[in-house]
Curated annotation (Swiss-Prot):
This is Putative response regulator NtrX-like. Residues 5-121 form the Response regulatory domain. Keywords: ATP-binding, Nucleotide-binding, Phosphoprotein, Transcription, Transcription regulation, Two-component regulatory system. GO terms for molecular function: ATP binding; ATP hydrolysis activity; sequence-specific DNA binding. It comes from the Bacteria. The lineage of its organism: Bacteria, Pseudomonadati, Pseudomonadota, Alphaproteobacteria, Rickettsiales. The modification 4-aspartylphosphate is found at D54. Member of the two-component regulatory system RP562/RP614. PROSITE patterns: RESPONSE_REGULATORY, SIGMA54_INTERACT_3, SIGMA54_INTERACT_4. SMART domains: AAA, REC.
Amino acid sequence: MSQLDVLIVDDEESIRNLIAANLKDEGFNPKIAANSTQALKIISEKPVSAVILDIWLQGSEIDGLGVLEIIKKRYPLMPVIIISGHGTIETAVNAIKMGAYDYIEKPFNNDKLIILLKRACEVTKLKRENIDLKSKVIDKTELVGGCPVTLKYKMEIEKAASSSSRIMIHGKVGSGKELAARLIHKQSKRVNNPFIIFSPTCMTTEKINQELFGESEKQENNNKRPTILEFANNGTLYIDEISNIPIPIQVKLLKFLKDQTITKPCGKKTKVDIKIITSTAKNIQDEVNNGKFLEDLYYRLNVFSLKVPSLYERKEDIPLLVKYFVKQLSKFSGLKERHFSDEAIAALQSYEWPGNIRQLRNVVEWTLIMNPLTTGNNEIIKPYMIPSEILANSANLTKLEDSFDMLSMPLREAREVFERQYLSAQMSRFNNNISKTSSFVGMERSALHRKLKLLSLHIPPTNRINEEEYEKANA
């Protein structure tokens, strides 16, 4: 087994050297640091397997609890064992609440420390293996789908990931803007560094100011909690719904973007390296025109503009998305894995989905919960099992509209009404894709073009697969 790197952080040199010697005898590779600055530098250069951390760190810029907070934010799985010569029960409890693996008082028994350290490393190893196993089953940063719109979108994400420019993600509510940001980070050179999400929605101006810049009227002088910008250093900062940031903070953010420099409580200026991704469901240009967003800030953040397609634009992906959500819910929520019938999928594809991907996932979950697998109920999900509001607002594929009485019509007229409704629903289902619609309904594309013209069903020019064929069919 390869040696595990363990960082020892203590302001007393004799303690550092003693622990380091004992760890070396036990097959560990010890690293030492006398203060918070040295400790965080060592970890940022190469994450260690575990940390043994003194809680006080006299003369250090940040005390042990502050270092613990930073480590758990950046490396949630990294085990930290807290040591202290004059701690209290309250201090120990606080350390454990903040994520410390355990707490041990000085003077400590060397064998006890070694046993504790080995146990912490083993537990962390099992956690990592469990996470790796789950990620192989379902990748939470996977963009599901293979329709042309999605493939183009995936290519745009790859370009955004390879770029060092700032990125603004535009998309409707529930379309997957955070997923896009995660994918960009995952495919970038910063993948092994922090990915920090900051959502200013529902925050006060003072709270946003404190989180980003560490400035607050209520902040005590000895409160040196790192800011969001410090946490994101060398990584990616994703600011969700950037339009919710008030003008005073926009001014400060604009100033920061000019040189990416932050000022610490001591007055020292520090340069940080952050890839900034923002997102919005609003039209920021309209916000600029209405005086709600700084024009200069908009231009600085919107260097690379990425539009997230709505679910309506990628209805062909719905079968794959449904399978993905069913598998995900089965693995992590305990719901039985089910199969949606072709008719149920068709009904889902005919819906407009104003809530986009998020709404589809909720509908799949609701359907599985409300239709449990029983002895009298097979595994197939039928259309009637889907929420009634979805069916009511879908293009109906199973019956004629109520606005006419089929029995009162001649055969030719009734057939024409049925064909219009049927083809309209199928075209909507396949997002006006002539090729896929014709393949499903069993018609040649040219014949389908003629039939649509005869029924006065028009196709948007952007969805005509072959303009030359279209013109020939409509000549």
